[in-house]
UniProtKB/Swiss-Prot annotation:
It is found in: Secreted; Cell membrane. It comes from Homo sapiens (Human). Residues 20-44 are annotated as: Framework-1. One of its GO terms (cellular component) is extracellular region. V region of the variable domain of immunoglobulin heavy chains that participates in the antigen recognition. Immunoglobulins, also known as antibodies, are membrane-bound or secreted glycoproteins produced by B lymphocytes. In the recognition phase of humoral immunity, the membrane-bound immunoglobulins serve as receptors which, upon binding of a specific antigen, trigger the clonal expansion and differentiation of B lymphocytes into immunoglobulins-secreting plasma cells. GO terms for molecular function: antigen binding. Residues 78-115 are annotated as: Framework-3. This is Immunoglobulin heavy variable 1-18. It comes from the Eukaryota. Residues 1-19 form the signal peptide. Residues 20-117 form the Ig-like domain. Immunoglobulins are composed of two identical heavy chains and two identical light chains; disulfide-linked.
Length: 117
């Protein structure tokens, strides 16, 4: 059977008292098992390197699952144990963008993926 599924990526936005903080993610993608996906999260409205970026996901009918965190200041990362070896988080400070790459995709990776400050 040819398994495919949708991996959805939404826009996360928050409003501060004096400026609008926005995290704008790349669009929905459809991937096959074994493939990889790289999601972008472009930040604006604040100093990118002053905060870390977390990645979470929500599978259908499930709660939020924390995937990991990256420091936008120095690139230090902390990944969920269950994703170790399959996930890589990076940042590009020149464009205030964070990236999350997930490899060797499986059916249970079907989820809505979010970045958050």
């Amino acid at each position: 059977m040819d398994w495919t599924w949708s991996i959805l990526f939404l826009v996360a936005a928050a409003t501060g008292a004096h400026s609008q903080v926005q995290l704008v993610q790349s669009g929905a993608e459809v991937k096959k098992p074994g493939a990889s996906v790289k999601v972008s999260c472009k930040a604006s409205g604040y100093t990118f390197t002053s905060y870390g970026i977390s990645w979470v996901r929500q599978a259908p009918g499930q709660g939020l699952e924390w995937m990991g965190w990256i420091s936008a200041y120095n690139g230090n990362t902390n990944y969920a144990q269950k994703l170790q070896g399959r996930v890589t988080m990076t940042t590009d400070t020149s464009t205030s963008t964070a990236y999350m790459e997930l490899r060797s995709l499986r059916s249970d990776d079907t989820a809505v993926y979010y970045c958050a400050r």
